[in-house]
Amino acid sequence: MNKIEFAYYEKGNDILLMITGVGGSTNGYANKYERIARQAMDQWDMSVVVATTPSGSWMHAEQNMKEIMDFIHSKRLNKRFKVYALGNSIGANIILWHFNQFPEIEKILAINPVMTVNLHLFRLLASVDKSVNVVFGELDESCKFASMLPASKSVKVNILPKIDHNFTNSLDLFINLPNQYLFNQD
């Protein structure tokens, strides 16, 4: 298994956690994660952690989530804080499958989770009491499986028309998703 890489931006007490898709960098395509990080620091006074998702991570998702949260705790020491988690592609799966083990995770934005891998692990969403927004691009392969997510009053599924897995030609829309779905500021 490859090593998770981290980027850390220090600002406020609470944390925006972003977990990339497989092979993603801490900056992201066209610096999308870096741009969201700057937005989080400037608009929401948050610190930011970006964690990459190495190849094969879905097979070690629980271990990876623990490593990511250990990294966050090493930066926060004994402070109380909330985590607002954004996962993209398999990074969304990692969060959705294991967030319940970490009470400091307050809200979740899962962008285009891969619904063809370990579908049974999504069952825990049926009893979740945290705000979970799952966003699919209409043209993403996993969108056709969106109805297989368990029904829950806390889980909202949103389908964006004419958007593919990579948000091709829609980078600004991707960058605005935390505003809309984590912080409810259209």
Indicate residue ranges for each PLM-predicted region.
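Active-site nucleophile loop of the alpha/beta-hydrolase fold
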Residues: L109-N118, L139
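Short, surface-exposed "cap/lid" segments of acyl-processing enzymes
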Residues: N2-P54
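Alpha/beta-hydrolase active-site loop
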Residues: K32, S57-N78, W97
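Gly/Ala-rich beta-loop-alpha elbow adjacent to hydrolase catalytic centers
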Residues: L86-I95
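Catalytic histidine-centered segment of alpha/beta-hydrolase-like enzymes
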Residues: M59, I163-I175
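Conserved alpha/beta-hydrolase "acid-adjacent" motif
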Residues: E141-S147
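Short beta-strand/loop motif that positions the catalytic acidic residue
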Residues: V128-D129, V134-F136
